[in-house]
């Protein structure tokens, strides 16, 4: 359910805005999205795992808040991020 340190580092490298960047909204959203995808796959096989389901809802809420913040601060970065992550259809 969790992501490996190597995968997390790869996401940081892919979505960073500058060198040494680990906390920008883009990086945080990318990491949360990866965790959400993994947890969604887990819940497909373990439908009655309600503790994990609640954790999923918390993560989705965190991602929504970060995306709202990014949209408020910089619409262009927001649009680029959701396109790269494939969040909107």
From Swiss-Prot:
Q: What is this protein called?
A: Small ribosomal subunit protein uS15
Q: Which InterPro entries match?
A: Ribosomal_uS15, Ribosomal_uS15_bac-type, uS15_NS1_RNA-bd_sf
Determine if Ribonucleoprotein is one of this entry's keywords: yes
Q: What is the species of this protein?
A: Rhodospirillum centenum (strain ATCC 51521 / SW)
Taxonomic lineage? Bacteria, Pseudomonadati, Pseudomonadota, Alphaproteobacteria, Rhodospirillales
The UniProt entry, under HAMAP family, shows:
Ribosomal_uS15_B (MF_01343_B)
Q: What is stated as this protein's family in its record?
A: Belongs to the universal ribosomal protein uS15 family.
Secretion signal span? none
Q: Which Pfam families match?
A: Ribosomal_S15
Q: How does it assemble?
A: Part of the 30S ribosomal subunit. Forms a bridge to the 50S subunit in the 70S ribosome, contacting the 23S rRNA.
Q: Which CDD domains match?
A: Ribosomal_S15p_S13e
Q: Does the keyword rRNA-binding apply?
A: yes
Any one Gene Ontology cellular component term annotated for this protein: cytosolic small ribosomal subunit
């Amino acid at each position: 359910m969790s992501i490996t340190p190597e995968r997390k580092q790869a996401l940081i490298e892919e979505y960073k805005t500058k060198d040494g960047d680990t906390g920008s909204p883009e990086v945080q959203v990318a990491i949360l999205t990866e965790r959400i995808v993994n947890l969604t796959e887990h819940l497909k096989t373990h439908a009655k795992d309600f503790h994990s389901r609640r954790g999923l809802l918390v993560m989705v809420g965190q991602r929504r808040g970060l995306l709202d913040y990014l949209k408020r601060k910089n619409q262009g970065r927001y649009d680029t991020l959701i396109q790269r992550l494939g969040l909107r259809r």
